[in-house]
Amino acid sequence: MMTSPQPASKGFSRAFWVSSTVELFERMAYYAVFIVLTIYLSNILGFNDFESSMISGLFSGGLYLLPIFTGAYADKIGFRKSMIIAFSLLSIGYLGLGLLPTLLEAAGLVEYGETTRFSGLPDSNDRWMIIPVLFVIMVGGSFIKSIISGSVAKETTEATRARGYSIFYMMVNIGAFTGKTVVDPLRNVIGEQAYIYINYFSAAMTVLALLAVILLYKSAHTAGEGKSMREIGQGFLRIITNWRLLILILIVTGFWMVQQQLYATMPKYVIRMAGETAKPGWIANVNPFVVVCCVSFITRWMAKRTAITSMN
């Protein structure tokens, strides 16, 4: 008979704290790269503004679409195996982002330094090797979108769930804040090469998360209990025929379309308007900083109010 692991801290299990901590590492890795992804695509790989925006946008869209399928697969194999798969893919992907420019430079298509000097890369099809690399990150990240929050739900009770998610989202935003503070100081020291080396930082963070899961994540809620593809399809059909839910999705989509401009266009805009000494990472950090400072207070304040009241 399986027994529940002893709690690592009053009210929460060790699995809860491991899940929250590896999410912090994952967010550090993701935002360290994503805050400069469009700049990386243009300044390192030679894509124009339209191409880099399209690639970044499709990457983000896929990252939020794939959890429909990867989440169902994660349910079948269990959270621990899913996290191992996710962080393995993310580590490979971020390492690939760092190594790809080295291969392109070795091919004589570009020379990297404080500033990038192209010698054929913008006209070469070799730069499109970035697509499979980003796809690996997209698949790994799509697992994380569903399994970490699902693990938190499994490891909390009705009495501790609100506080548990408050802690979880605080860790998410600490990770987002910390990740975006790395690239600007690095850019001040080594110039545009920072957009390459930041990927090794992200790979290191996801390797740490992978080791934490392998060595520390033990949960009573590991058995797969997933749905069939038919059940997933039926559930999806119910969603798209629920007009109230669709309206909510459209409202939330509008918010995220605006919010994503912090990463799609703002970094390039700030650097081009204010010069190379500008720090877009710190500008983008206003959002997670406010969340970290206010999330506990807001959670307590809205605890006895309905979700609709909170959203309004």
Language-model-detected regions and their locations in the chain:
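C-terminal ends and interior cores of transmembrane alpha-helices
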Residues: 88-125
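Extracytoplasmic gate region of multi-pass secondary transporters
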Residues: 31-39, 179, 243-284
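Central cavity-lining transmembrane alpha-helices of secondary-active solute carriers
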Residues: 57-72, 285-298
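Symmetry-related core transmembrane helices of the 12-TM Major Facilitator Superfamily/SLC fold
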Residues: 131, 196-215
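Intracellular juxtamembrane helix-capping segments at the cytosolic ends
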Residues: 143-157, 270
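Juxtamembrane intracellular "pre-TM" segments in multi-pass secondary transporters
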Residues: 2-13, 223-249
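Glycine-rich segments within core transmembrane alpha-helices of 12-TM secondary carriers
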Residues: 62-63, 162-187, 203-209, 284-288
